Amino acid sequence: MSDNQQPVVLGKLGSSHGIKGWLKITAYTDSVEGIFDYVPWLIKDQGVWREVKVTQWRFQGKAVVAELEGVTTREQAQMLTNCEIAILPEQMKELDDNDFYHRDLIGCEVTNVNGYNLGIVDQIVETGSNDVLLVKANAKDAFGKVERMIPFVTEQFIKQVDLQGKQIVVDWDPDF
């Protein structure tokens, strides 16, 4: 299965809440309640993805708790603690132009406008004002760089993103 076919992890199941099988939810979505916009969920239970349905959810203080279909006891809920919550890639919402999912940018080759290969996107760092590409430099980088941090600011630094070709072109000095 390729990376684009793998389930997309949106959160994880936390500890049990109460005696009726409810679970605390840790969501990686922009808003905590945004995870409930995706139906159905997949959970990775004992190494195998399986589909689950959320029957209801609510805020519980600062936490969010949910009831899953078929989970009716505290013991059943405890068996699911720390299971990842995911969806199929085709369930991902369509984005506007110049918006990208982090998972799609990771692994892209980054070159500058002069054709110099700066390396591969290893991760995305969220800074609050804008995301930053953490680019792992090639082993034989002519400038001796191990990694570069390039602000993901379209028009100013990011000139082109080709997700099909896994290429990003940037206006960036390789010595910086």
Curated annotation (Swiss-Prot):
Its main location: cytoplasm. One of its GO terms (cellular component) is ribosome. GO terms for molecular function: ribosome binding. The keyword Chaperone applies. SUPFAM superfamilies: PRC-barrel domain, Translation proteins. Pfam families: PRC_RimM (PF24986), RimM (PF01782). Residues 97-176 form the PRC barrel domain. It is found in: Cytoplasm. Keywords: Chaperone, Cytoplasm, Ribosome biogenesis, rRNA processing. It comes from the Bacteria. Disulfide bonds: none annotated. GO terms for biological process: ribosomal small subunit biogenesis; rRNA processing. Binds ribosomal protein uS19. The PRC barrel domain binds ribosomal protein uS19. Belongs to the RimM family. An accessory protein needed during the final step in the assembly of 30S ribosomal subunit, possibly for assembly of the head region. Essential for efficient processing of 16S rRNA. May be needed both before and after RbfA during the maturation of 16S rRNA. It has affinity for free ribosomal 30S subunits but not for 70S ribosomes. This is Ribosome maturation factor RimM.
